[in-house]
Amino acid sequence: MIGRASAIGSAARLGTRVRVQTNVWLTSYSVVEDDVFIGPGVVTTNDDAMARGGPGYELEGPTLRRACRVGGGVVLAPGVEIGEEAFVAAGAVVTRDVPARTLVMGVPARVVREVPAEELLRPRE
């Protein structure tokens, strides 16, 4: 599902059962695995040199691992990885990788706690 006014870069890769809410920018070279939720107004970036990388410089979008959840208004820096079943709270700015099954929040995003077992997505059979 892709929400209204959202844009997906031509080189982005999306898995199955991905939900992209309204007004999301999913940049090229982003990788989104199965069962991911992306809240409204999320912005991803893929260029940490702001077009001044020089010869051989490559763009790198974020990677969102299986069943992670990204809250509204989150900003994901180039190349960050959001771990499997991780939760990024609304308004966070993620500049470093987020470990699997953790909750992060803040600017910059910091680990607050682990995601409780009862909040994990059960694998589909």
Task: Tell me the role of every PLM-derived stretch.
Residues 1-105, 110-111:
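Structural signal for interior beta-strand "rungs" in well-ordered beta-sheet cores
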Residues 115-124:
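A glycine/serine/threonine-rich, flexible loop-to-helix segment
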